[in-house]
């Protein structure tokens, strides 16, 4: 079921990691309905972070056995997984920090 939750900065979507089987579920906050559900690339889905422009969700997954943990990247406009990156085995939480270009 739902494990960690994050609301997109624009306030339109709620993204949930699904523990126990691994996956992601996205809800439209205006209607309260699920608009997308997908299995993650591993079973230990954990943390959720959203890009500042509300376009992408990043979900961390713990590694199982000797498999590495992963961060899956989901496009919240196209509603599909667009990438996956191997990370350390204990990839529990995740945070997104927006960096602004320096003024000259």
Language-model regions, residue ranges each:
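Predominantly soluble domains enriched in secretory-pathway, periplasmic, or organellar proteins
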Residues: 1-104
